[in-house]
Every structure is written in C-alpha cells, then in structure tokens.
Amino acid sequence: MEEFQGYLELDRSRQHYLLYPLLFREYIYALAHDHGLNRSILFESAGYDNKSSSIIVKRLITRMYQQNPLIFSAKDSIQNQFFGHNKNLYSQILSEGFAVIVEIPFSLRFLFLLERKEIAKSYHLRSIHSIFSFLEDKFTHLDYVSDVLIPYHIHLEILVQTLRYWVKDASSLHLLRLFLHDYWNSFITPKKHITFFFKGNPRLFLFLYNSHICEYEYIFLFLRNQSSHLRSTSSGIFFERIHFYVKIEHFVKVFFDNNFQCILWFLKDPFMHYVRYQGKFFMASKDTPLLMNKWKCYLVNLWQYHFSVWFQPGRIDINRLCKYSLDFLGYRSSVRLNSSVVRSQMLENLFLINNAMKKFETIVPIIPLIGSLYKSNFCNTFGHPISKPTRTHSSDSDIIDRFLRICRNLSHYHSGSSKKKSLYRVKYILRLSCVKTLARKHKRTVRTFVKRLGSEFLEEFLTEEEVFLSLIFPRTYSTSRRLYRGQIWYLDITSINDLVNYE
C-alpha cells in the first residue's frame, strides 16, 4: 500500500506557489489576448497597454470580493457587471488572464514528463486521422466494446480540491472559487446570458474541464497499471479461492524469489484499449465480458466515491464489437465480417471453404451531416439545397471560393470513408447551393445560370484527392478511380470542421 501511495503522491518539486501576483502583470493579459481561443469582438479595440494595469486589476478583485456570490437573485445576476453583456470589459480580461495563470503548473508538468521520458515530438500523432489508423490495426482483433459518456456535473468544491494538488497558492484558489460560484449562479439567468458567458470564457472552463478529465484519467491509469492487485474482496468467503492464492504465493516464493507482481501481470488484460473523444470514451477488449464488467464496476465506484457523481451502472453497456457501431469524430466506425468462399479440388474431391475476415469500416453518417448543413442554411430539413441570402452581397469569386473551401475541407476530412455515396451527396448539396446563391444574386433562374457557367464550374468542385490522383494516373482512369474510392487517412488534420462537429 505504501508503494501505491508513493505512486499517487505528486512530485513536490513540481508544485508551484505564488501564482496570485501574476494577476498584476500586464504581459499575462497580452498573452491571453493573443491566444486563439480568446478571439472576440470585445478585444478588437482594446488597448492592453493602458487597460490592464495593476490598479484596475486590484479594483476589480476588490469589487468581486465585496459581493457575496451566494445570495445573488435572478435580477441581480442579470444586472451584475461582472457577467453582464459587454458592460465591463475589464472583468472579461481578468477572467482570461486568470485562465492563463492557472495553466502554468500543468504546462510545466507536461514539459517535465516529456523530458523525463524522452518522448519524441511526432506531429503526425496529433492528427485526428491517426486515431482511425490505430483502430484499423487493433479493433479487428478485439471482441467487446463499451461506449460511455464521461460524467462532468460535479460539485464546485471538488474542482477546487483537485486543483489544490497543483496550485498551492490559497489566494488563487479563493479567486477561482469566486469565479465558479458566479458561474453557478448564472444558471438562473436567461439563456442568452449563459450563452454569452460560455463564449466569453472558453479558456477558463475548458481548463477546468480538462483538469477534471486529467484527474480522472490519472486514477484510471493507476488502476490499469495495478489491476493485478485489485482482487475481489467478496471471494474471501470461498475457502477454495483462499487456498488457491496461498498455493500460488508459496509457488512464487519457491521458484521466483518473491516476485509475485511479475506473475500476476499475466492476469491483466493486455488487449484492453481506451480512447477518449469529445467528452466520451470507449473501452475495447479481446477477452470475455468478465473483464469488461470488472472495469465497469471500477469506473462506477470511482465516479461515485471519489468525484461524488451519481452514475448508474446501467448506462455502461457492454456490446459485441461485430454488432455495434461507434459514432465519433464525424465517422461511424464498425467491425464487419466479410465472408468469402474458396473452391478447392483435390483429386476427385471438391471442397468449398468459407473464410470470414474482420474488416474495420468507417462511413459518413449522412443524417447528422445534413442536419449540420441545415443549421448552416445550405439545405432544408429534407436535404434539398437552398441559397444563402447572407452571401449575395459578396462578389462571385468570393462566393465560389467559400463554397469550394467548405467542400474540399469536408472531402479532405472524410477521405477515410469506406463508402463515398454520402460524401457525393454532401458535395451535390454544396455545389447546387452555390449555384442557387449566385442565381439569386443575379436574379436569374438556376438553369440559365448553369448554362452560363458551363461545365468548367462543376469541375471546380473536384476534391484535392481526385486532382492528385489524376496527375499520377493520367491515362489509367479506372485505377485512379479505384484508389480514390478507397480509404485515405491524412496526418495533417488537427481540428474538426464546424460542419463535422455535430455531436
């Protein structure tokens, strides 16, 4: 047990103190302003040289501490200057600067782990498509899978206690507690104020969510590495089981010099894989459902007793991988059995051999993607293309370039699809929506406008894959077409398109 406690104990040399004085440094707010997550209309005309001085920050913190966040009413929350709609720019800047400061201990710890383990910085592993190439290699050998939504409705004080392991500055923790209580009281405000609050503080709450996930996965990794020591306590009532363990321990003492942990390592599940994505995760295993049920019990107890989150065990389903599909990152992935019949003849005897091979398939779910196109006003609810009136004021080249960019980005992201039929339909919707937008701008019919543009306009919607393969195989069109129909994974995709992120 002392060894396990040492494993979970944090390296005290990596714990950093006195983060609170950084709130009064102007360069912190300049750093928060330059970060990509904090691009906002509020900051376009803000001069950080004279609007984030230490005097203003001190006044803001004093004003926040003078208010009692526990007795806000609905009316007070709406009129609160700290969370009001564009009423106090300085409070917005303060929250963004605070988010940068509390990230410092985590960033330094991450760099320390990279240096200690000498992990090579491979930019290809950052690609979203690298996950699917990994699944292609592993999932065809697995049998069971569980798709679980990570519970995140935890108590505010648990978030603060989690950060206490990393941030030892009491003043910073008190200020964080004040932010969280004000955030909690904002739930009683109208929806538009909540939406503005989330958009105005993306970095702070993204950090809080990631810290919660980091704590959960840190313990989960500990359970995974030490799973051979977690025997069932209920088995103690069976004397045969106790006698079995005693015999094994005696056998180990005699032949393996007390190296019991190495022997128990073989009782682990070496084929258990864990993948997290967009607030969810799935586990897949090769062995019987017994091991999956064991991990199900561990996770439920972890969330209930460590994070005080009530989680029903029935929400974790264990499914056979060959009969289940995973919807994540814009793809619907599954493992299918492809059977083939081989005819063999030996002398006068004829044999028919059935071969069943597992294949990892990824398709594009058309219904959610059409829903995203509908929300962006590219089509109606039935998938029929419509024009975009908001684009009629732009030039023809800008309209065409915008539609081409969206079409090529979607084709580039969904290049790993096993079946291209859904992708062809999406390209058809975007292409016809572009034509209708241009026809509406020039006040002409679609047929007349298509005749004016000619076939060259339709060729503009060729994807990068088609153009690339046509250059390699200029005379073998059937070969290039067959290659394009196959799966192509790119290692330069690090983010999800807004139209793909429909979950």
Swiss-Prot record:
Q: Name one Pfam family in it.
A: Intron_maturas2
Which keywords label this protein?
A: Chloroplast, mRNA processing, Plastid, RNA-binding, tRNA processing
- Where does the UniProt annotation locate this protein? Plastid, Chloroplast
Q: Name one GO biological process term.
A: mRNA processing
Which InterPro entries does the record cross-reference, listed alphabetically?
A: Domain_X, Maturase_MatK, Maturase_MatK_N
GO function term, MF aspect, one: RNA binding
Q: Which GO terms describe its cellular component?
A: chloroplast
Q: Which domain of life is it from?
A: Eukaryota
Q: Which cysteines are joined by disulfide bonds?
A: none
Q: Where is the signal peptide?
A: none
List, alphabetically, the PANTHER family matched: MATURASE K
Q: Which family does it belong to?
A: Belongs to the intron maturase 2 family. MatK subfamily.
Describe the task this protein carries out.
Usually encoded in the trnK tRNA gene intron. Probably assists in splicing its own and other chloroplast group II introns.
- This protein's name: Maturase K
Name the gene.
matK
